[in-house]
Amino acid sequence: MTVSTPSKPHICRFPPGADPDVINQAFREDGVVILEGFLTPAQVDKVNCEMKPHLAKVRGGNMRYGPMDTSLETTLEPERRRIHNLAGLSETFRQDILNHPLMHELSRRVFSEFGDYWQYAGSVIDCAPGTPDQFLHRDQPAQKLFNVGPDAPEGFINFLTALTDFTKTNGATRFVWGSHRDWIDKSDENHPIVVAEVKAGDSLFFSGKIVHGGSFNGTNDTYRSSVALPIVPCIMTPYEANIHIPRSTVETMTPLAQRMIGWRSACLPDPYAIGTWTLNMNELGEQMGLKSKGYLEN
């Protein structure tokens, strides 16, 4: 089946159960797709419940630690808050999102030439009323190793899942159409801005190469929240460390989810298919005697 990009820019939407190969083709062509019902209403409610006390703290301006000089936090507008360490804070993130079948089907297809992959970070992004337009940017790291143009392999993908509805009024994410292909940094008549309005539970699956940014939240009382799950190949260092998560918590996770947060080894592809992130040249979890929920996948 062929997915054709419409003449008028429009983000393709895929219902639950859609063919991952078709989704991946549209992703490669357009740089962004919408995965409808990525999380169920019950999962959305559970994440929102788990995050409620943490959101109350950041919305109140209460910070436990002062940011380091190079912290991402120093770049955020006062209205835009982030809660990181979801693997430590959210059971739904650990058990459901990190094991999401479609997320893994798509990640495997994108990063097949690199071998395994893991999470770059897991966070909730919370945008209060009055949050200004976010500057347009690419997520893929700007270092020369990765910033080599549209024909380079994908080095970064993101699953941005709405915890509330995204509308033009409350600041839905906007994308510069075709910017992942033509390597431009701002919109023009051939690369218009396309706004992604989605329902809670839908996920924006997009390339690290596409230029995008959140929009102005022009409401008086609506917070716009989402779970951001960026994924990178295992040859890249994650943004977030997870060594602080209690072992007893990690051992409630599947081996696949454990690998996603760096508690298991990853594997490089053929012809040099050896493990990486190892202990004594062998699988990290096995060497540590790490227990898990289920069995280690090959």
Swiss-Prot record:
Q: What is the lineage of its organism?
A: Eukaryota, Fungi, Dikarya, Ascomycota, Pezizomycotina
Report the Pfam families cross-referenced here: PhyH
* Cofactor(s) this protein cannot do without: Fe cation
**Where Fe cation is bound, by residue?**
H137, D139, H212
InterPro entries listed in its UniProt record: Phytyl_CoA_dOase-like
The pathway that the record names for this protein is: Secondary metabolite biosynthesis; terpenoid biosynthesis
- Coiled-coil ranges per the record? none
Q: Which SUPFAM superfamilies match?
A: Clavaminate synthase-like
Keyword terms of this UniProt record? Dioxygenase, Iron, Metal-binding, Oxidoreductase
Gene3D superfamilies (UniProt xref): q2cbj1_9rhob like domain
Known EC number: 1.14.11.-
Q: What is the reported phenotype of gene knockout?
A: Completely abolishes the production of novofumigatonin, but accumulates asnovolin G and asnovolin A.
UniProt name for this protein: Fe(II)/2-oxoglutarate-dependent dioxygenase nvfF
Q: Which PANTHER family match?
A: PHYTANOYL-COA DIOXYGENASE DOMAIN CONTAINING 1, PHYTANOYL-COA DIOXYGENASE DOMAIN-CONTAINING PROTEIN 1
Q: Which reaction is this enzyme known to catalyze?
A: fumigatonoid C + 2-oxoglutarate + O2 = novofumigatonin + succinate + CO2 + H2O
Question: What is one Gene Ontology biological process annotated in the Swiss-Prot or TrEMBL record?
Answer: novofumigatonin biosynthetic process
What quaternary structure, including any partners, is listed in this protein's UniProt entry? Homodimer.
| Superkingdom as given in the UniProt entry | Eukaryota
Give the main EC class. Answer: oxidoreductase
